[in-house]
Amino acid sequence: MTTPNDALDFYPTPDSLAFDMVFSLREVKSGFTTYPKPILEPSAGDGALARQVHALAFNVHHDYKTGEVDRYDKEKARSAELDCIELSSDFRAVLKKDGFRVVHDNFLTFRPTTKYAAIVMNPPFSAGAAHLLKALDVMQDGGKIRC
């Protein structure tokens, strides 16, 4: 887990909470578990939530020592319907290295070309309300938010 950073307004999501947030998005239909798609992580930080989305919704595995996508899962990672946004250039670089698609740097100025079926987020505490309102704006009708 990454260390909190007050200057960045960054407080990492514990792995167990990230798992619970993403797992709660699942839908069981006719005995099959599916996840809504596409999914947005608008304040991706160190990738804790994004890694859980990759693992649960897209069966993409990351090496827990390096964070990088398992060599056998690189193609699945590229095709995963998961978009990440991150303000910190350092975190963006790590997310890209770890196999995530980073589509923008500032969620509040993001103008998506599609609406999202699910949004999982741990927004900066100082801008939590603005991030939640923006999430409602970029979510599909009937979509799901986990915050």
Model regions and ranges:
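Class I S-adenosyl-L-methionine-dependent methyltransferase catalytic core
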Residues: 1-147
